[in-house]
Every structure is written in structure tokens, then in C-alpha cells.
């Protein structure tokens, strides 16, 4: 019941005066309540701005009753006012109607002035107490209309603008968009560290001066800014013209074939050079002194003699080129022989070191963080250890470590560890197939007194190909565990120190198996022939 109706009823009946007074007090209390709460945006907006907006365009639950609808905008009354004729309107709607359409009520055309409008605080309080649904897509919350603005400030489904690309996204998605998806997010070139928007990265990568590119001729990897000099000066297989191309030799060949071409075509090049000199001679032949326009003088030198001297010099230089080429080939042969000798000595030293481990070998795998990153990026990681001997004489073995990819079936994100037999110096003096016990351990590198190593013990199975005498340098069949250790357990422990993983292999042949097994240790089943 509006305040106007209260006053009319008071004039007609004394018995209803108490009711009107109570209603007026209720309306007054509503005004105070709304002015104190400040929960709704309309209470905080200036009157000039309020006159420009219409009713509440929100979804009510249950639906809005018609008595709370503005007859002009057909939405829920905002800043409800009442006319002397008893109709309710949004303050902004009726004010605009009076100014634009004249001083009359839009419903019954009764004369209506702006100063005759008065706030309907009772209706305002009733409307602000109605339940509405959050208008943001995806949000299922409901609240009183008076709390809608506060909710929208914190609603995770409200639309906010991306400061980088100026597109709208829900608040719950904006951080992910800004960091991961926005085409205008700032990234840095991994090669030159220049910052740029992500959408420009592909274009930059195609021209980055510090990006690694592969020479199309020799396959050498260089940074882009070095490639022009590489093509022009260093690339051994880049096509180059003959040095005598200016004299008429039109052959093209790889740069590393140029010296041979010059050697094999010396006579041709000399003839071309002589012809060029002869042509120069003809163009510079002494002319008649009576022709000053040619610029010639009777005292010009003897060009024929000069040509003969140049030809003689070319012949001598040709001989020198042949001698230098022969010396270079001889030196190249000596260098190649020295390289083979050094390689042989390095192999012998490595073989001697492998024989000194006496069946206990610790494999240091450096840059292990790089291998873990490759595994996370689903790039295969397979590493082989250097060879080592079980004794002197003894069998030659090596280890193979495989980081299983996240997509691998049944063994995703596991370390696989295997042992392979190799061709060794003493194979002809040893009994085959190999028989013995092998203990594989990933060492705990903590400083604790008692270290939590991860280890497995396995017995050789002579019937498997993995333990037969190898016919090639390394037996392709291995013996070990596909699921030796999970990568999560590896990361949680202290197995990696200074970016290095330590893997220990202890081997005891059937003639030396005492003391290898720990009391009470039961080996689990292995994966053979992998």
C-alpha cells in the first residue's frame, strides 16, 4: 500500500488513520534502511545520472509481479516514484516522459508536474528485497536485488576486458588468458631475449639474427647472422664459380672441389687468361700519333714483351700450385693418420679404465634435468653407459637407461634400466652364456648416515639371448626392469644432486657370488630381452 493511499484513507475514515500512520512510519523506515545500507548501486549514484537510466533489467525468481513494473520501460521499478493519480514509475522514466511528451501521466493523461512526484519508498524496499538471478552467463547464484551489485563486483563469471588485446572474458578465465592464451601477451625470444607480443613471435623467429639455422648445403648449424659469411667463405659444399670465371670458365662446383678443378683445368685456364691478356693488348695497341683523341703517345711501352712476361709468370705459378696441392694432400693424409692413432689410443685408455672397476661400476649421468625436460616434452630419452668389465679377465657389460614417456602404456613416467653384454677382450676365454647376479642401484645422494637407495637384484637367465655371447659390439637384447623406479619418487627423494644422477651396477659371476645378496632380500621379477 503506497503512502498516497494511506493519506487518502485517513481523510475518509478515522479508524484507518492508525494504519496510515503505521504505513507512513514503515515507508520512512524503508528510506532510512536503504540510505544506510548502500548495497545497491542506485543509492550511490548521483541524481543527475539516475535520471538517465531505466528500470532493473534482471531476471527475478519468482517472476516479477506486474505491480512492480514500470509502465514506460516495462522493467522493475528503479527509484520508484508515485503520481497523485496513484501510478508508479521509475524516476528517470517519468521525468523524461514529462520533459519530452508534456505534463501528463502516461497512463491516464492526468495533469502531472515534476514537483508532484514523490518517492515510493515502500515499493522500493519491496523490490530490493526480491530474489534475482545473477545475469552473468554460467553463474547460478541467486540473491536479493539489493545485493546484486556487490555480487557482480566479485562474481567469477562477470565479464572483464583484457588489458592487452581489449577482448572480454569471464573473470575466472582472465588470468589464464593473459598468461597463456592472449595473442598480445609478452614473450621473449629464446635466442636473442628480445621481448615481443606472442602474435609477432612467429614472424620474429623467421628473421631472428641469433636463431640457429641449418646450412642447406653442408648441414652445419649456425646462427642466422653468421650464415652469409659461411656461404661466401667457409661452406665446403656451397656452389661456387670457378676463379677464372671472369676470363670465360663457366664451371660451377662445390667449394671443396674447387682446388681439384683448378688443378685439372690448368691449361684451359691459362689459355683463357692468355686470350684475355691478348684482348687487352689489342685494345691498348699503340695508335697513330696523329690521333690525339685516342690518348696514345709514340713513347708507349712494348706490350708484346709484357704479355710474354705475364704468361711466363702464370706458368711458374701453375707449377707452384701443383706443388702446394701435392703437399696439402700429403699433410691431410698425415693428419688423418694421426687422428686414427689418437682415437685408437683413447679407445685403449677407455678399455683399460673399464677393466679396473672389477665388477662394480658407478655411472654418472650429468645434465639430468635436461633429460627430464625432454621426457616431459614427450621426446624419447635413451642413454647408454660406457662399457665396464666384471673383472680381469671378465665379461664386458653396459647399462641402458630409458625415461618412459607420459603416454607410454603400463609404464608411463617410469625409469627403465637394463644391462647389455658387449664384445670384450676376454670373450674367447670365458664360459658362455653369462651366468651370475646383478644388483642395480640408483644412489641416494643425501648427507644422511642411512641413505635410502633404490635397488633391485636380478639373476641372469642363460637361456635368454641377452646373456649369449654378442656377435656385434653391443648385444641389442637387454635384461632388466621396465618399471625400475617412478619419476615422481625420483623427484621426491634426494637422488639428483648438482644435476647428476648416480647409477651403480654390481656384478658377480657364478664363480664370485658370495656376499652379493643381502640377507632377507628377495629380488622381484625382471623384464627379459627388452
Curated annotation (Swiss-Prot):
It is found in: Cytoplasm; Cytoplasm, Cell cortex; Nucleus; Lipid droplet. There is a cross-link at residues 124, 142, 461 (Glycyl lysine isopeptide (Lys-Gly) (interchain with G-Cter in SUMO)). It is an enzyme of class 2 (transferase). Its EC number is 2.3.2.27. GO terms for cellular component: CD40 receptor complex; cell cortex; cytoplasm; cytoplasmic side of plasma membrane; cytosol; glutamatergic synapse; lipid droplet; nucleus. A zinc finger (RING-type) spans 70-109. It catalyses: S-ubiquitinyl-[E2 ubiquitin-conjugating enzyme]-L-cysteine + [acceptor protein]-L-lysine = [E2 ubiquitin-conjugating enzyme]-L-cysteine + N(6)-ubiquitinyl-[acceptor protein]-L-lysine. It holds the Pfam family TRAF-mep_MATH. Pathway: Protein modification; protein ubiquitination. Its main location: cytoplasm. The keyword Ubl conjugation applies. Sumoylated on Lys-124, Lys-142 and Lys-461 with SUMO1. Residues 358-507 form the MATH domain. Residues 302-356 form a coiled coil. SUPFAM superfamilies: RING/U-box, TRAF domain-like. Residues 1-362 are annotated as: Interaction with TAX1BP1. Keywords: Coiled coil, Cytoplasm, DNA damage, Immunity, Isopeptide bond, Lipid droplet, Metal-binding, Nucleus, Osteopetrosis, Repeat, Transferase, Ubl conjugation, Ubl conjugation pathway, Zinc, Zinc-finger. Belongs to the TNF receptor-associated factor family. A subfamily. Homotrimer. Homooligomer. N-terminal region is dimeric while C-terminal region is trimeric; maybe providing a mode of oligomerization. Upon IL1B treatment, forms a complex with PELI1, IRAK1, IRAK4 and MYD88; this complex recruits MAP3K7/TAK1, TAB1 and TAB2 to mediate NF-kappa-B activation. Direct binding of SMAD6 to PELI1 prevents the complex formation and hence negatively regulates IL1R-TLR signaling and eventually NF-kappa-B-mediated gene expression. Binds to TNFRSF5/CD40 and TNFRSF11A/RANK. PANTHER family: TNF RECEPTOR ASSOCIATED FACTOR, TNF RECEPTOR-ASSOCIATED FACTOR 6. E3 ubiquitin ligase that, together with UBE2N and UBE2V1, mediates the synthesis of 'Lys-63'-linked-polyubiquitin chains conjugated to proteins, such as ECSIT, IKBKG, IRAK1, AKT1 and AKT2. Also mediates ubiquitination of free/unanchored polyubiquitin chain that leads to MAP3K7 activation. Leads to the activation of NF-kappa-B and JUN. Seems to also play a role in dendritic cells (DCs) maturation and/or activation. Represses c-Myb-mediated transactivation, in B-lymphocytes. This is TNF receptor-associated factor 6. It comes from Rattus norvegicus (Rat).
